[in-house]
Every structure is written in structure tokens, then in C-alpha cells.
Amino acid sequence: MEGKEEDVRLGANRYSERQPIGTAAQGAGDDKDYKEPPPAPLFEPGELKSWSFYRAGIAEFVATFLFLYITILTVMGVSKSSSKCATVGIQGIAWSFGGMIFALVYCTAGISGGHINPAVTFGLFLARKLSLTRAIFYIVMQCLGAICGAGVVKGFQQGLYMGNGGGANVVASGYTKGDGLGAEIVGTFILVYTVFSATDAKRNARDSHVPILAPLPIGFAVFLVHLATIPITGTGINPARSLGAAIIYNKDHAWNDHWIFWVGPFVGAALAAIYHQVIIRAIPFKSRS
Amino acid sequence: MAAGSGSGSNPKDYQDPPPAPLVDTGELGKWSLYRAAIAEFTATLLLVCISVSTVIGEKRQSGEGGAGVLGIAWAFGGLIFVLVYCTAGISGGHMNPAVTFAMVLARRVSLPRAALYTMAQCVGAVCGAGLARAMHGGGQYARHGGGANELAAGYSAGAGVVAEMVGTFVLVYTVFSATDPKRKARDSHVPVLAPLPIGLAVLVVHLATIPITGTGINPARSLGPALVLGLGTTKAWSHLWIFWVGPFAGAAAAMIYHHYILRGAAAKAFASSSYRSPHF
């Protein structure tokens, strides 16, 4: 474990750069101070019989429900008022999304992993951190939770909800669909990249701040992306959030743009997964023993 | 996240404390119980005084250089963060009868302690609101609603109760997650960050429901300003039941969710409860 302190201090990789990519990790395999978990199988029959599998699904449902309820209610509170000064404003909306993700990831990380977002689930699935069955189960539960959360907000004041856009994501006028798609891709990339960094076995072992702070940078990433892209798309970066609001709002102009909020986040998540696994960690180049 | 590679068959890496007795006569003779009650009183006083003062200050300046509604939400969320940080080790840092109620249901505190806490919190909230009234003057205080919780026009009482209920659910669910021995043992971020997500949960609930109810999610916080505004006649007084029924219902729901779904009884029914999710 020699040089670990140095490595932590520099925040750098301890292998010298003269060694060719990929071979370094193999040579030093016996004194690794972290253990890479094996890739999750595509289908694992055992987990279907375990209570923790269903508990994780319920946790994702409840978390996404609360997420949509709080955030859409905040959006409604801002958009119903004629003067933005009398409301929490755009920054308040961004805090609502970011703060809620922080609190919910903190609460559910140990139960289900705390995804609350099909794009995150998809990214982690690409990195083989969860099985296909689990990924699909999570995504279904997230979408159901999102629909229920938006439904409760609509139930509070139906006219207000339908009259103010229902918190649905649409590309703002003045921006093309390409702009919206690009914004969603980059936004989701930031989020999923942060998630990968926070959950990386190697980083967890080397830098003590990584496991301890984990939910905080994830929440902040969501907050910052919202600050940046609320004027463009209202910020999806979460297909469940976009779907829940779109289904409950159910108007054509929301549905026309809806594909952007699935394609964008999934592409962004895939890019982040590739970036992290291939470039940062070079996992495909390492032999697995 | 931190642990998670172990197989489920090894001895547990955490220990659940035994349930607190309903009535623990031994603790009544201890100074630490009364010290905890005093800490709850002081913390609730500070919470209500500063936050109500922020509300009145914002309304007095309405739009011109005031803290804004976002500032009000931060006042509540930030104060909860700071005060939980300060008093968690003394009394548990409840400052909220709904949280205390959930802790009784989960058998984490005894009944006499909970009754004492609730009383201390309510008295502290009344004193805090009184202090805020003294700072701003009675006339200004009454003109701007006294920072009391009342239902906004256009919302039914049912919507108010549901808003309070779900808001309190978010808060109490976060509190349970932060204080769960199993979570603490497994994920290193849980004990370290604890007061921060609790404060941010309060912040986001305020962002969402200030336009509906002004956001109670804390019966003591709602009681204090309502009493200081005047008994019986005001709108705040007639709506007060919403801010007791909603939070207690939400706290009970969060306790059931955490205790039965996430932690306990239902899991035991499944033989293979040892499967761990891939940690994030």
C-alpha cells in the first residue's frame, strides 16, 4: 500500500506514465488496495426470489414519487404567480431538484442504490453494475412513481396545473430541438459522470472524501445542471420526471418534444458510462482473474 | 457503498438498540433528561424566532431587497441543519413534535420523554414567536400574518392536509434514514452527513409548499405564531388543526414505511433476505 498517501494527496493515478495503458493494472494486480466487483449477470434468477429486490423497487417508487411531488409543486408555485419576485424563483426550482436528489440519494443509496432516474439506471446497467431484470424493474417503478407524484400535484389544483404547463419539459421557443437534445445529453453526462465517480471502487478506496460525501456532489450536479438548462428545456435529465409530468399533463405540445427527454438522457448516460469505464478506468483492457 | 461485499450469512455488522420502554422510571431521575428537554426548548425557540423573523422581514420589504421566498425556505432549512448539528448529541435534535411522535412509534424514546420534549418544543415555539413579535413590534407582526401557517386561497383543507402529510413524510423519512444503525454501519456517508440532508429536506419541502400552506411540517412551529397572534379569532387559529393532523399522519406513515418495508417485519417473511443490491 506504499505510495497510497501520495496518491491520495495528488489525487492522481499511482502508476507511472511510462507503462503502456492497460498493462499497468495487470502487473500490479496483487497489491491492489481495492476490489472491483464482478460484472452483474444479465439475468439473475436468485434475486427475483429475494425480498430485497422488491424492497429496492418499492424504495425507487417512493423516492421518485416524492421527487416529482416536491419538484413539480415547486414549479407550479413559481409559474402560477405573475411576479417571479413573490416566489422562490428559478433558483428555488433548481434547489428543489438538487436538494431533493441529495436527500433522496442519501436516504435510498443503501436500499436500492438511489437511482431515482432511468438514465442513471441505464448508465449503471451499461457498466454492468446491475442486472437487466433489476434495471427494467427499477425503470418501471421509477416511471410509476413519477406519474403518481405528478398526479398528486394535479389533484391539489387541477385548473392551475393545466394552465401553467404542468411542469412538463418542452423545448423553449427560440431553441431548436437539436439545442434541447444537446442540453439534455450534456446535462445527463454531468450527472451520470458524478454518479460513476461517487460509486467507483477504486476512488472509494483511495480518496476518503469520495464515499463520505457521495450524495452531496450528485445533488449539486443536478442543481447546477438545472441552473444552466431550465431556460432551454426546463431540464429533464431524468426520463421518469419528464414522462410523469407529460402523462399527467397530456397535451400535444408536451408530447411532441417528449422523445428528446428519453433520447438525450440515455445518450448522455451511455457516453458517461463509456467515458468512465473505458477512459478513466480502462476496465475493458484489464484481464479479470 | 462502503461495505457490501460480505455474504449475508456472517454475523450482523450492526446492532439495533433494544426498543425503548414505554415508561422508563429510571430516566426521570436523571439530569440528562431535563437537559435534553431544555435543549429542545432552546433549539425550538431559536428556530421559530429566526425563521418567523425572516418571514415578517421579507413581507415588510415585499420584493425590494428582501430575502425573498427562497430566503425564507433557506431560513428554515438552514436553521434545521445548524440546530440538528448542535443538539443531535444532547437530545436527538427533534425540535418538532412530529419527529418526536415518529420516534415514539419506532420505540426509540420513551413516552414520558416524548411528552416532555413535545411540551418543551411547544413552549419554545411560543416564546420564539413572542420574541419575533417583540423585535418587529405588535402592529407590524399582526399586519404581516405573524409568520403563522394558514391555507392559501384556492386550496381545500384536504389539499392542505395532504401537502403537510407528504412534506412531513419526506422529513421524517430522512430522519429515520440518518439514524438507522444498519445504514450507519454500511454506508460511511450516512453518519457523517446526517444533519445536512435533514436540513435540505426541510428546505425543499418549504420550496414546494410555501405557496399552499406556508409550510408547517412542524406542529410546534405552527402553534407558536398562532398562539401569539391571538386565541380563537384568527384564520391561523382555525386552520391550526391541519398543521397537527397532517404532520402526525405523515410521521406515522414514514415510520411504517421505514420500519416495515425498508427494515423489518416484511423482510423476515422472505427466506432469502440476504441478497444485497449492487451498491451504488
From Swiss-Prot, chain A:
Gene3D superfamilies in UniProt: Glycerol uptake facilitator protein
Tagged with keyword Cytoplasm: no
GO terms, molecular function: water channel activity
Cellular component terms (Gene Ontology): plasma membrane
Gene name as annotated: PIP1-1
Major location category of this protein: membrane
Additional record remark: Recovery of PIP1.1 expression after chilling is increased by pretreatment with mannitol.
Residues annotated as transmembrane: 58-78, 93-115, 136-156, 178-198, 212-232, 260-280
Tissues/organs with expression: Expressed in roots, leaves and anthers.
Provenance organism: Oryza sativa subsp. japonica (Rice)
Domain of life per record: Eukaryota
Function: May function as water channel to facilitate the transport of water across cell membrane.
Stated family: Belongs to the MIP/aquaporin (TC 1.A.8) family. PIP (TC 1.A.8.11) subfamily.
Induction pattern: Down-regulated by osmotic stress, chilling, drought and treatment with gibberellin and abscisic acid (ABA). Increased expression in the recovery (post-stress) phase of gibberellin and abscisic acid treatment or drought.
Motif interval(s): NPA 1: 117-119
Record's comment describing the protein's domains: Aquaporins contain two tandem repeats each containing three membrane-spanning domains and a pore-forming loop with the signature motif Asn-Pro-Ala (NPA).
Motif (NPA 2): 238-240
GO biological process, any: response to water deprivation
Keyword NAD appears in the UniProt entry: no
Protein name: Aquaporin PIP1-1
Swiss-Prot record, chain B:
Coiled coil stretches, renumbered: none
NPA 1 (motif): residue ranges: 96-98
Membrane topology recorded in Swiss-Prot or TrEMBL: Multi-pass membrane protein
Transmembrane residue ranges: 36-56, 70-92, 113-135, 156-176, 192-212, 236-256
Tissues in which the protein is found: Expressed in leaves and at lower levels in roots.
Ranges for region Disordered: 1-21
Main location: membrane
Keyword Membrane: yes
Signal peptide from the UniProt entry: none
Keyword Transcription: no
Motif (NPA 2): 218-220
Gene Ontology, cellular component aspect: plasma membrane
Record keywords, A-Z: Cell membrane, Membrane, Repeat, Transmembrane, Transmembrane helix, Transport
Subcellular location(s) of the protein: Cell membrane
Protein family per UniProt: Belongs to the MIP/aquaporin (TC 1.A.8) family. PIP (TC 1.A.8.11) subfamily.
Main function: Aquaporins facilitate the transport of water and small neutral solutes across cell membranes.
Annotated protein name in UniProt: Probable aquaporin PIP2-8
Organism field: Oryza sativa subsp. japonica (Rice)
Lineage, broadest ranks: Eukaryota, Viridiplantae, Streptophyta, Embryophyta, Tracheophyta
Gene that this sequence comes from: PIP2-8
